[in-house]
Amino acid sequence: MSKRNLRSLISGLAISLIFSTSLFGTASAEDRQLRKIFSGWMTDYSTYGDTTKGQIQAMDYVVAHSEMFGQILPFWYTLTSATTIKDKYATQNSIDKSIPIATLQSLGIKVIPTITDGTAEGVLSKIMGSDANRTTLVKTISDLVTANNYDGIDLDFEGFAFVDKIATWPTIQPRWVKFIQELAATLHANNKLLSVTTPYLLDPTTGKKGYYFYAWPEISNYIDRLNIMAYDYHKFDTAAGPIGPISWFEPSLIYALKSVAPWKIYIGTPNYGYNWVTKVTGVCPTNTPTSEKKSSNAAIIHQLKAQAILDKPGAVATYNEKYGETNVLYSAEFNGVNKTGATTSCKVDHSAWYVDARGYGARAKLVEKYRLGGISEWEIGYGDNLAIEEVKKVAIAMGQDKVVGEVSSSVDNLLYGESAAFNGTFKLADGRPVSGVPVYMDIKRSSGTTRRAIGSTATDGTFQTRVLLGETTDISFSTDETWDRTLGQTPSKSIGVSRVISWKIPASMKHGVTYKVTGQVQPRIAGVNVVLDDGAKVGSGTTLADGTFEIVFTPSKIGAKQFRIVTDGEINFSSSKSAFVSVLVR
């Protein structure tokens, strides 16, 4: 190809690209919404910790970073029987739990508290194995969710794995699956979410199964969240090593993806680590802290205060890419006397492992790679700002196009049995229409909230529908969240519905004579207060079960009068007013 032809081709491609970009548009950074991929457990003792005593206030941390949180898992409850759930929050806090719940939900954060298993060995399995007791347990949990207006519940039943005997696992599995199916049905019927938190499982084709009885493939269609506990590979009572190395838990994550929808999966991420004593050289003096003995368990360290380890004299920190964790090595020397008073000294070698900001970023990139729901932090409030900022970088890169919904209604008030027409649009923030997507009508009444499909948007992003209303209703319209788009939601429209009034009154009356005004309201119901009105109240009555009413009154003034019937406003109905009727009072 000649240079002249090559220049012409490049020029043509450039013009074509400019044209196509201006024609179809692209979403700017301002038109995209940060993806809420951060989650975690907030314990009862740290929700409102006493900062004067050095305690953590997890709520402060969540509020400060609220744009990152799609959900919070308050670690507040322990199951003790099929009918009893212990409230740990109530024993730790003077602030009523309705305060943090309302605060979080006002920030658009779903509140899905965790229930742990506080029963003895084998007890929970037996409960789930009994049809009657399992039904009772489902009701106990669903009642807790409803009573506190939670968005769902998270089950962290680790007793199966770490208390019950391995020989019982084959029996536990079908009982667990049956329980999950029944609890999910109850929660979903009330628009509540079911989350489960479990240790790792492995693909059985590899010859390893992990804690297989949690049965991810069997429960995948029933749960809404799966938190994988990707930590405690090494613990305080083991040899030194990484807490939750990526190379260890990623195979479990890949196995989960074979049966569980990616957006349901959250990587359990520790913001803690351990500081082990790995070697003691010499004989330590009597004033050496107990924690410096080789026989002692490792001391826990939190990401928030890890700098104290890094500041140790001679400390060398190394970030391990494979593990996604940082290892800090240092030595401490102690001089003094032994039990006999003789001079002595020792050198204590330490090895500390923890997940720092880089480790959080690495796990967030796994969320991006596999299109997961996010990461779940244990425990909220003990992480530093650098870590969540690393996650935020990925959350921004994974941002969704913002969907903006608008809707108008043909009326704001109507009579019982009449319908209202709605016309609306869904567009991206930059004005591009959201076409061909299902639209749902969200109906909120005093009796509850329902959601039903009404069709799809047209090519220009518009939708129309007409609704027959039987009571006062708040209506909004929505589109589902997708990987690329946010949830679309129109403002709510409140449509008042008034009862239909039919009534009779004589066209001519004599003053001083008593008359009966009769009528009926629709829908028919007893107990509706009905008033005869001529500009002021002149008589009243109450409807019977068939909606009929009777008002007795005696006109006292001569002349042409205007009368109407008025009903009181109710929870489900607006006040009704009939048309005025002219009556000649002689």
PLM feature spans:
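Enriched for extracellular/lumenal, surface-exposed ectodomains of secreted and cell-surface proteins
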Residues: 469-491, 561-579
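Short, acidic Ser/Thr/Gly-rich low-complexity loop/linker segments typical of extracellular
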Residues: 450-460, 538-546
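Glycan-binding loop/region signatures in secreted carbohydrate-active enzymes
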Residues: 271-363, 395-398
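Conserved, mostly hydrophobic/aromatic
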Residues: 72, 155, 226, 267, ...
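Substrate-binding surface in catalytic domains of secreted glycosidases
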Residues: 84-95, 161-309
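Glycan-recognition patch characteristic of GH18 chitinases/ENGases
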Residues: 30-141
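Short strand-edge motifs at loop-to-beta-strand transitions and within beta-strands
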Residues: 461-465, 547-551
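Beta-strand-rich domain onsets/edges
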Residues: 289-290, 394-430, 494-516, 522
